[in-house]
């Protein structure tokens, strides 16, 4: 038997001796009191030598099948029933005799999911990652410039229909936004533009033209009939959207009108340029 087991048995014996010692010491005292009480019952009381009438009566005894009475009459000089003190049962403090630590148990089953908690505070900035690979090339951005200046060396007379003024001389045509075959400027960069038109009038004829935006008459260039020809001009600024068209139109022949030019000099010019792109704040 090991030293641990012997120590355990010795501790139990000491604990039982401490707990039951006072109880066992009371047993002889109780037996002596019981014996004295029995002797007093047998001997008559010296204080009352004469027998009382109540004692001569026959004591009550229940008949067969009859229960005992619920109460009984006692004399004041009769000895009372001995009262014994209730002692709690002994208890052993297990913590005094603590054993060795046991083995780790098996892992339990996973519990139910709890309620979703509130969003936590923003975390700290993480370390800088590695440099990524080069991406695919993007599309070319639109040029934020637009400008043109063209001229005409041939005279033009009105007829039964409206006529677009077509130009034959190209001074500036940045990115070819002005179409020399149709005589129209096409807007590729939205924004605010400036345009100007210069013509030479014809003697004894009216001069009647419009600067057009798509199919809308924006401004007129007009000169009355005169004995002498003069240079006449018109200019304006317009806000254009992408795919808008700007061109010059000669009025139809209800009223005879014309513009003058010759092959030696350029009398008719039309110019325009971008002032501010729409993408700029």
Curated annotation (Swiss-Prot):
Its main location: secreted. Transmembrane segments: none annotated. Disulfide bonds: none annotated. It is found in: Secreted. Glycans are attached at residue 93. Residues 35-68, 107-136 are annotated as: Disordered. Residues 141-281 form the C1q domain. Keywords: Collagen, Glycoprotein, Secreted, Signal. Residues 99-140 form the Collagen-like domain. Residues 1-25 form the signal peptide. InterPro entries: C1q_dom, Cerebellin_Synaptic_Org, Collagen, Tumour_necrosis_fac-like_dom. One of its GO terms (molecular function) is identical protein binding. Residues 51-66 have a biased composition (Basic and acidic residues). One of its GO terms (biological process) is positive regulation of aldosterone secretion. Pfam families: C1q, Collagen. One of its GO terms (cellular component) is collagen trimer. PANTHER family: CEREBELLIN-RELATED (PTHR22923), COMPLEMENT C1Q TUMOR NECROSIS FACTOR-RELATED PROTEIN 1 (PTHR22923:SF63). This is Complement C1q tumor necrosis factor-related protein 1. It comes from Mus musculus.
